[in-house]
Structures are given as structure tokens and as C-alpha cells.
Amino acid sequence: MKKLIFMLLLSSGLIGCSAIDYSELSSPVSPSDTQIERIISLGLSHSDSLLEANKLMDPDLVAIVVKELENRKVKADEAQIEEGIVAEYAEKIIILENNSKFIGPEINVRRKVGLMLESDYEDYYLKGQKDLGNGSISHQLYLSLKYNADKLRNYNSANFCDKWQDCSSGKKIVVANIQSGAGSCSGSNCEYREIFELEFTDEVLKSYMNDGLSFVITSKRNSNKITIPANYIKGYLRVSN
């Protein structure tokens, strides 16, 4: 009998616990958040929103609300600029073969190397091929490296950098050297060019849309860090996907 009573009391206690309204335990909305959302809901211009914030009676509350409104304005402006750059890249995508082939605009980078003020020239663009049968897309990065040296560098491997730009232990990238050779020479140095294609899956490329994609391509004695901006990737994928 005692055991039965104990079980009844225990079950009623559990039922009581399950009936607790946990929404009441959530963090209360601060006065500043309330005022910020109220002002934003008015649909005012930024300057008028600041005027509305300055009507508040508490000077400390005014300072907090104004600061947050300014921060949101900066973020909105940055997002607008970013969208403009993305749209510009997207407009430059070349579409071929019944919407199955995509070629992005070429990016040209001049990079100073060494103490002799020599320069490496890095030219690259993304291109993609869509399988019209199953809709899958494969992507390649066309990369041209031009430099002056006493011999060909023979780049042969590449690996990703992480979001902290550490490239020492990143995953390997499939690299195909499709062309290399020397141009004009002066003394012991010649102008060399090596051209590569690097393979990226659609999933991998999409994972770098927010932070951009950086990788290091290396030879026995040299390494070059290549960075594809996030807005370039977004513009390219906006069209290719």
C-alpha cells in the first residue's frame, strides 16, 4: 500500500514538472531592445530613426539605442556594397552550351616576392560544367602563374587553408598541370609560365561562399597562396547553380 501511494505521488510530481511553462524562464527583453525594435518598425530613414531615439527620456538608454542603430546602418551599408560586387561578378559569367557550361571573369593579381622586387603574376578564373542528365555540377579553377626565375619551379601540389589562414595541414586539392614553359630570357633568368586546373566539387565550393577560398600551391622551393574572394564565389555560384 505504501509503495502504491509513493508511486502515485511520484507520478503526480512528474506531471507537475512537465506542465511548467518554460517560456516564463527565458531572458527578459531589455528596454533598449524594445525601443530598437519599436523604432525600426516605424520604417523611418536612418536620420529620422536617430531623432526618434533621442526623444527617449533616459540618456543612457538613448546612447545604447543610438549606438545599435548606427551599427545596424553600417552593416546594412556593407551588405549593400557586397551585393553590388556579387551582382557585378554574376553579370560577367559567360554561359555556353545550353546553360551547361559557365566561365567566370578572370582575376589578375601581381604579388611582390623576395628582396629584388620581383613579381609573380597570378591569373585565375572559375569554370563549371553541368551534367544536364542529373543536374550535378563540377568546378575547376584555371590558374596561371607567371614568374622570372633561373629554372622552372614545377609546382606539383596544393592544399586548402583553414578559416584562420593556416595552410600547413589543410586537405589536398587535385592539381593538373596542363601547360608549362619558358618565354623571353635575360641573363640566367627566364620568364616562366605554369598553367593548372584545380578540381572542386559543388559542395566544397559552396562551403567557401561566406569566407572565401584560400589555398597554397607549392613546388620544391616555392609556394604561392591564392585567395578567391567570397563575393567572386557567390557571383559565380549565383549563375552556375
Model-found features: residue ranges?
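A generic "folded-domain core" signal
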Residues: 18-203, 207-210, 217-241
